[in-house]
Amino acid sequence: RLKVSRVSEDGVEDIVPRILRVIRLGQDVDKTHRFAEEALDRAYAAAREFAEVLKEHPVDGIRFVATSATGDAENREEFEDNIEQILGVRPEVIPGTEEADLSFLGATSVVRRDVEGPYLGVDLGGGSTELVLGGDGVSHPNTQVQAAFSMNIPAARRTERHLKNDPPTEAQIQEAIADIDEHIDEAFKTVPAGKTRTIIGVSGTVTTMTALAMGLTEYDHSAVDGASCSLEDAYAVDNKFLKMPREERLTYKTIHPGRVDVVGGGALLWNRVLAKVSEAAYADHGQRID
C-alpha cells in the first residue's frame, strides 16, 4: 500500500489516496523460510510503481513498514537491499505490538460515533493476525489500546498448511479449525475478548468477505470502508467461499486475483475469530455479538 499525505496542526490531508497492490510476500515462507522469487518480483514491481508516483509528489519523508512475514524469511536482507535501492528507504520491520497499535488506530478511525465499544480490532495479515482491544465504550472510539496479542497464524499459511485440496476436505477444515482455535485461546489469555462490544476487521480478507456479504458484484473500497455486517451473514459467506473450488472463486470480480488461492483460509480464520469472540462476549456479559 502507498499513501501520500500532508500532515499539519489542522489534521491530515490525503495527497495521493491509498494505492493497493496485492503481492503476497509471505507466499510459501511457512514451508521454505524464504521469500519466493515470484513474490519478490511482485514486491519490486509495486515498489518501482510507487517510486514513479513519488517522483510526481516529492515528500519530506518516507516510512516503509514491513511486518512479521519479513522477519521470518532467510533472504530478508536481499529484499531490504533491493527495496532501499528502488525507493531510497530501508524497510522497517515492526514488532507485532506496534503492528497491533497501528491497526487499531486505522480501524477505529472509520467507526461511527454511535457504535458501541470496547472495540476489538482484528487484522488478518500476511505474516500474523493481530487482536487489539481498546476504546472506552463511552465516547467516540479513542486510540487507547487496552490489550493486544499477535498470533502467528496468517491467513495464507492456513491455506498452505491445512487446506491443500481444492476444495478442501472436511478433515482438512477440522484440522485447520483446531489449529486456529488453539492460537485464539492462547491470545485470549492476554486479550480479554469477552469485553468486546464491536468487532472491527482490518485486511483484504475481511473487506473481501464483507463485499461478498453485501452482494457487490465488483469490489468497491468506498462502499466497504466502515460498512457493518451481521455475524449470520459473515458466517454464511465465509463457509460458502471456504468450500468453493478455485475455478468458481475466479468468476467473482469482488475477489482480487491475488487473493483467490488463499481466500478460503482467510475466510475460515475470520469465521473462527468471530465465533470465539462472540462466545467470549456471551460468557462475559450474557450477550452475543450479532
Description of each model-found segment:
Residues 1, 122-128, 202-206:
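A short acidic Gly-Thr/Ser loop motif
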Residues 1-14:
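N-terminal basic/disordered segments at the start of proteins
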Residues 6-9, 24, 28-57, 69-118, ...:
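Helical "lid/coupling" subdomains associated with nucleotide-phosphate turnover
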Residues 15-18, 148-150:
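Residue-level detector of high-confidence beta-strand sites
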Residues 19-23:
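A structural signal for short, well-ordered beta-strand segments
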Residues 61:
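Cationic, histidine-enriched alpha-helical/coil surfaces that engage anionic ligands
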